[in-house]
Amino acid sequence: MPNWKKVAVSGSNVNFNQITSSGDMLFQDSILSYQTNTDIDTGTEVVATIDGSAYKAAFFDYVAVSASVNIRAGSIMVAHDGTNTTQAEASTQDLGNTAGIKFSSSIDGSNNFRLSAAVSSNNWSVKTVVRGI
């Protein structure tokens, strides 16, 4: 069976059923990135990082899971000025209890824009799709 490939030509209309990427996807001055930390233990750990010198805002779409029964999905919107971050979160209601996880954002010394999770018990998993603009 032949394996046909579509070629996108400037000015043409191409319909792709699926695009698979093993890395980040760049769209002009924006980025789409899948990042995960699947073993967050008691304390604070980085979940996702994005280049703060390239992007002033990021949207972290996430699912947080503990013990397979404590689940929350949401989106954390973060903006920064190079020194400070501000964030807002919209999320689903808990399935089980996700009170044991709190998210925070920061800028590190290399101007990386970070989303961190502070957890009160071991074995949390957070998967994110990060949109940087």
Regions found by a protein language model. Give the residues of each.
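Short, surface-exposed beta-strand/loop "edge" segments at domain boundaries and coil↔beta transitions
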Residues: 14-15, 66-72, 119-127
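Trimeric beta-solenoid/beta-helix "fiber body" segments of extracellular/virion adhesins
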Residues: 21, 29-30, 66-68, 80-82, ...
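Beta-rich globular "head" domains
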Residues: 46-82
